[in-house]
Regions:
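Short helix-capping/linker segments at secondary-structure and domain boundaries
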Residues: 59-64, 219-220, 245-246, 295-302
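Noncatalytic linker/hinge segments flanking ATPase motor cores
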Residues: 44, 106-111, 169, 254-255, ...
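Active-site cores that bind ATP or allylic diphosphates and position pyrophosphate for catalysis
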Residues: 132-267, 273-278, 323, 327
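Active-site neighborhoods of enzyme catalytic cores
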Residues: 3, 81-193, 303-327
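Short alpha-helical "patches" and their helix-cap loops
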Residues: 66-73, 253-255, 303-313
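Alpha-helix boundary recognition
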Residues: 115-118, 217, 278, 292
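Non-catalytic terminal extensions that flank enzyme cores
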Residues: 1-41, 158, 174, 263-327
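N-terminal Rossmann-like or analogous alpha/beta NTP/dinucleotide-binding catalytic cores
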Residues: 2-141, 228-229, 233-246
Length: 327
């Protein structure tokens, strides 16, 4: 989970503690995976392939596969995106267990966890603006490790100059660990590679890392299969789980689908989704075949349903292919 020196677990309110304990007990009873897209647009073929791999990983192990919509960042959500996501998954035959979960309907749960961390002294207010932090931004636009500018500041939690602070999780020296099935080894230096992550933004929105960490625990998620672009986000989520006194699930970070130039497919760059396949007259069997072939699970030009693909594979074969893809 993490080195003992990294942070101390926060005492949780009894209702939240009960939910976390129930989730961890659920994890022990059997496999529970999840797919968690954000409704910021239609799923592109890279998202769809990751969904297929996650679904296969769960079903080949006789496990449950939950569908959670990470829709907390409401300004980025797009009208019709949720319906599109659900329709696309159903059309491909990727069935999920239980009702669709929406993070926007679980804000109270995340706020309770945030309050517990604050009471324990594991958070501090940060008044650094994006402009102030711009010089330490990575070249590709991601924010580099926060330098701790406000860590020792004496500012309060209220507004100053009309602006509320963000809330950061205080990480002490130590390393973060998680079980990793496919990606790079699951170990990071907390302060050097992760830093004091924001759990509540200055605009009042609860942060992705907080909500994701709480959900993995409370929902009893045992295995997370997702794109390897999220490997670097795992450390922050593991740190939050450690602060809440719980171990993380097992992770499997799988390769992303890249275009001919080696660039990963993205919504921002207009990567094609199912609409493009529909325009070509491709049915679900042809699309599943192409998605599976791109991951080296079947020969090129294969035609088969998701259920037929499931019958052809074993968990050992899937593991072998995904581990080989990372070699």
């Amino acid at each position: 989970m993490s080195d003992a020196s990294l942070l101390a677990a926060a005492p949780l309110p009894s209702p939240l503690q009960a939910l976390v304990e129930a989730g961890l007990a659920q994890r022990q009873r059997g496999y529970r995976g999840r797919f968690a897209p954000s409704p910021t647009g239609a799923l592109h073929r890279g998202n769809l392939r990751t969904a297929l791999l996650s679904w296969l990983h769960a079903r080949l192990r006789g496990g449950a596969w939950l569908l959670r919509l990470d829709d907390l960042d409401t300004p980025r959500n797009r009208a019709g995106a949720e319906t599109s996501i659900l329709d696309d998954l159903a059309w491909l035959g990727l069935d999920w267990d239980g009702p669709v979960l929406r993070q926007s309907e679980r804000r109270g749960l995340y706020a309770t966890a945030l309050s517990a961390l604050r009471r324990q002294g594991l958070l501090y207010p940060c008044r650094c603006s994006r402009r102030l932090l711009a010089p330490i931004s990575a070249p590709h636009g991601a924010t580099a490790v926060y330098p701790g500018t406000c860590r020792a500041a004496s500012g309060g939690w209220g507004p100053a100059q009309g602006r509320l602070p963000s809330w950061r999780l205080r990480l002490e020296p130590g390393r973060l660990h998680w079980l990793e099935s496919y990606g790079a080894p699951g170990e990071l230096d907390g302060p050097a590679a992760v830093g004091d992550v924001v759990l509540r933004r200055a605009d009042g929105y609860l942060a992705y890392h907080l909500a994701t960490a709480v959900d993995e625990l409370v929902l009893g998620i045992s295995d997370v299969v997702r794109g390897d672009d999220l490997w670097s986000a795992t450390g922050a989520q593991v740190a939050v789980m450690a602060a809440l006194g719980a171990a993380p699930p097992r992770y499997g970070h799988v390769p992303l689908w890249c275009d001919g130039g080696g660039r990963r497919l993205s919504k921002r760059e207009g990567a094609e989704g199912l609409a493009a396949y529909h325009q070509l007259g491709m049915d679900a069997a042809a699309v599943v075949g192409q998605l599976a072939a791109s991951a080296a699970l079947v020969p090129a030009a294969s035609r088969l349903s998701a259920a037929e693909l499931l019958q052809q594979l074993s968990s050992e074969r899937l593991d072998q292919v995904l581990r080989g893809a990372q070699a």
